[in-house]
């Protein structure tokens, strides 16, 4: 576990620990993990500060780190990129007021299978639907309670 930096507010260090997390994961690529879950908190935590320029820097940092990770892991892992809520994508309302709270906007969902096979996904899915695709990747049977929950068409 790599700790977040000790700063009063994250707009002072919008990159947080993203580069350290990325470097550590790349350094441990050869460990052969079955599953890796990574959370870049930058866009969320910096978004809460209301500082647009810092939020832009946070998004650029995460974009850079995801690109580096994709280039290393794309041939060995299925990759899912998503979020559980928005924040940094909408920081100013129609009246010019600063927004520091989570949004209810749709978030991206990217599934990049290492096999590059084409998979059709629902247009309107929910966070609960992500579990189904993770179970498929890990070749684990879906519990009966999840019968209606799938992001795959």
Task: Show which residues each predicted segment covers.
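Feature captures the catalytic ectodomains and active-site-proximal regions of enzymes
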Residues: 1-153
């Amino acid at each position: 576990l790599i700790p977040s930096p000790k700063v009063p507010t994250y707009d002072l260090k919008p990159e947080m620990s993203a580069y350290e997390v990325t470097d550590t994961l790349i350094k441990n690529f050869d460990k052969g993990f079955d599953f890796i879950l990574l959370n870049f908190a930058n866009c969320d935590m910096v978004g809460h500060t209301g500082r647009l320029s810092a939020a832009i820097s946070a998004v650029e940092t995460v974009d850079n780190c995801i690109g580096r990770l994709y280039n290393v892991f794309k041939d060995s892992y299925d990759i899912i990129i998503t979020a559980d809520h928005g924040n940094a994508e909408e920081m100013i309302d129609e009246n010019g007021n600063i927004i520091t709270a989570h949004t209810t906007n749709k978030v991206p969902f990217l599934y990049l299978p290492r096999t590059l096979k084409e998979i059709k996904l629902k247009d309107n899915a929910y966070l609960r639907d992500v579990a189904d695709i993770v179970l498929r990747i890990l070749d684990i049977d879906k519990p009966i309670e999840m019968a209606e929950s799938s992001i795959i068409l």
